[in-house]
Regions:
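Structural motif
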Residues: 53-55, 94, 139
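A generic structural signal for residues embedded in beta-strands
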Residues: 57, 98, 142-143
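Short loop segments at secondary-structure junctions
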Residues: 60, 93-95, 146
């Protein structure tokens, strides 16, 4: 009886693991291992994001990427650039500027941990996006919860139609 239970449990684990692997490979599920947003498993939705939502964003959605060295782009197992997970901090009509304290201000309200850095943690130079900017109807401003996040501070506004809303399923 015990062996039968072990076999059944093993089959359940294999089945659930296979389903999760298929969903991750199909890019419906996102496994986040960075500190930009909470680490864990996220679900990608085909829904237009709004301010306060998290999004999955490809690098080509941003307006200022020509200066970025290739080593900034992590790749998946198929060699494709991995998209980022970021928080929508600003949207159509919002004004984004740099405050006196160095933090990004969105409509005059400071965003925590948002001061652009001159260098990353590896000592490589970073180029802050030129502010102020008022976001157009097709743009969103994406930030990270981490002071070291690589986001709109350096890459500019992102095209909203290239972004997918992402919701956390299991984070830690």
């Amino acid at each position: 009886m015990c062996r039968l239970k072990q076999k059944r449990n093993a089959l359940i684990v294999i089945f659930v693991g296979s389903i999760l692997a298929a969903l991750i490979c199909s890019e419906c599920l996102i496994l986040n291992t960075t500190a930009s947003v909470p680490r864990g498993l996220w679900l990608k939705l085909d829904t237009l994001p709004k301010k306060g939502d998290f999004v999955q964003v490809p690098i080509d959605a941003f307006s200022s990427t020509e200066w970025v060295p290739p080593e900034y782009f992590r790749k998946n197992m198929w060699g494709k650039r991995k998209p980022f997970l970021k928080l929508v901090a600003g949207s159509h009509g919002d004004t984004v500027e740099l405050g006196d304290n160095g933090l990004i201000l969105i409509n005059g309200i400071p965003f925590p941990n948002s001061a652009p850095l001159s260098h990353d943690r590896a000592g490589r130079p970073l180029r802050a996006f030129t502010l102020p900017i008022t976001l157009a109807s097709d743009e969103i401003w994406l930030l990270s919860e981490s002071p070291f996040g690589f986001d709109s501070r350096y890459l500019g506004a992102a095209k909203i139609l290239k972004c997918y809303k992402a919701v956390p399923l299991l984070t830690f």
